[in-house]
């Protein structure tokens, strides 16, 4: 398959190559309205929420998101369904031909972005929800012209590309804003002055959490549901949702603000019927047959949010265990150092087929932690041991975290599925880490 032959080009500091390939198809990215969602954390969940709400309202909806957990086609969905294999391969071959004719070499992410745009145009979608892969300014999805932009959070991640300070990271992410278009944004208060400078320069219309919209949880979780309050321009509104983790509140509020301040109107009753059925795999996802939660937190801020959620839902750390593994280049020491606040038992491993941190390094780090027990080993053995531990005593809970690639591997292992990708394809995919 062509994707397996892509080399590790990394990030192109510009949009010229993908722009030329898209021009070869008469710019399919301009054929549909779009919402573009950026953010250090929460952008994927917000994109999933928006896609579900538009779909429930009768819009033919495209969703472009990343990374995938099991099947690469998870990244390109139409009306909640993975792009069918025939359409995927057709779009991929077409993109490959144009790329080769132009003598260009797209990255893995750029190629899939072209495939997504072609698929959405050919399916005549009414709207596309586009999750930014990395940053914003030079992200392949920024070749589109979104009607609404969203920024879900700003924290330190990918600093070697985006910059070492929050101000630099904000500038990269806020570059997705469009002149005269709403920009729904959440970021730390101390960045307000920097944001104002960017707003004046780029000319977008700011819709800020804490100013134009806000909200709060209205109830604790009960039977897998939780209520939240949304406050926009009008009266407060209360909705129930199946996304119950405390850190998911901002994602829900951001999606609600898109519907209020964007050009589309979806009735409250449609929203109220859709939110209780929402699911977002790999983010506070409970397995149905095991006391196991999957959460792909993969940077210090998202890990702190996960720990707060665990402590709220499962306050006894002696009953909480972790199956954890991390990708090189991430601040794994800070992440692993946070976890003992919520649990005491650790199964340390490496996400398979990735450039992972050696589990022995994790063990060495954990060795100085008092009050914690840990074991270390290959993925299969640690998964078996961790799942067995979770079922030995009633009330125990196992949390799988550290990388979305680890979460995806557990989903395949737990369901008995083998990867639908060849070893070569997995190696290519592993160079683009969540």
Question: Which ranges hold each PLM region?
Answer:
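Charged, amphipathic alpha-helical linker segments immediately N-terminal to NTP-binding catalytic cores
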Residues: 1-9
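ATP-dependent carboxylate-amine ligase
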Residues: 3, 144-145, 167, 264, ...
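ATP-dependent carboxylate-amine ligase catalytic core
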Residues: 15, 19-30, 56-144, 160-162, ...
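Hydrophobic anchor at the beta1->P-loop junction of P-loop NTPases
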Residues: 35-37
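Beta-strand->loop->alpha-helix junctions that form or flank phosphate-binding loops
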Residues: 64, 184-187, 198-222, 241-246, ...
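Acidic, Mg2+-coordinating active-site environments of NTP-dependent enzymes
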Residues: 104, 124-131, 146-239, 252-269
């Amino acid at each position: 398959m062509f994707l397996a032959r892509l080399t590790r080009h990394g990030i192109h500091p510009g949009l010229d190559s993908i722009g030329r390939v898209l021009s070869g198809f008469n710019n399919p990215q301009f054929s549909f309205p779009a919402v573009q969602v950026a953010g250090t954390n929460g952008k994927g969940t917000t994109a999933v929420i928006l896609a579900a709400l538009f779909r429930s309202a009768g819009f033919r909806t495209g969703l472009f998101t990343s990374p995938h957990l099991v099947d690469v086609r998870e990244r390109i969905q139409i009306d909640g369904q993975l792009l069918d294999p025939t359409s995927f391969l057709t779009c991929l071959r077409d993109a490959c031909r144009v790329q080769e004719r132009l003598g260009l070499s797209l990255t893995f992410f750029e190629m899939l972005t072209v495939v997504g745009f072609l698929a959405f145009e050919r399916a005549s979608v009414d709207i596309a929800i586009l999750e930014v892969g990395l940053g914003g300014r030079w992200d392949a999805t920024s070749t589109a012209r979104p009607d609404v932009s969203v920024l879900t959070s700003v924290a330190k991640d990918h600093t070697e590309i985006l910059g070492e300070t929050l101000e630099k990271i904000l500038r990269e992410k806020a570059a997705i804003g469009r002149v005269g278009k709403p920009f729904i944004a959440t970021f730390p208060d101390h960045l307000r002055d920097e944001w104002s400078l960017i707003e004046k320069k780029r000319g977008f219309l700011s819709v800020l959490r804490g100013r134009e919209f806000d909200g709060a949880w209205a109830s604790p979780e009960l039977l897998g549901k939780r209520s939240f309050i949304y406050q926009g321009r009008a009266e407060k509104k209360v909705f129930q949702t199946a996304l119950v983790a405390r850190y998911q509140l901002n994602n829900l509020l951001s999606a609600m603000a898109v519907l209020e301040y964007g050009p589309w109107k979806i009735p409250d009753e449609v929203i109220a019927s859709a939110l209780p059925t929402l699911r977002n795999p790999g983010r506070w996802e409970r397995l149905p047959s095991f006391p196991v939660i999957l959460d792909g937190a993969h940077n210090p801020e998202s890990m702190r949010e996960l720990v707060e959620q665990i402590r709220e839902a499962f306050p006894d750390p002696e009953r909480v265990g972790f199956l954890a593994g991390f990708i090189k280049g991430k601040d794994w020491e800070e992440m692993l150092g946070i976890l003992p606040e919520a649990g005491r038992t650790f199964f340390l491993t490496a996400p398979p087929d990735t450039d992972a941190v050696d589990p022995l390094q994790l063990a060495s780090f954990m060795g100085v932690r008092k009050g914690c027990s840990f074991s270390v080993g290959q993925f299969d053995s640690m998964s078996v041991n961790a799942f067995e531990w979770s079922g030995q005593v009633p009330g125990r809970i196992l949390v799988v975290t550290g990388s979305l690639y680890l979460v995806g591997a557990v989903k395949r292992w737990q369901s008995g599925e083998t990867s639908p990708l060849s070893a070569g394809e997995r190696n290519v995919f592993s160079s683009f880490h969540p």
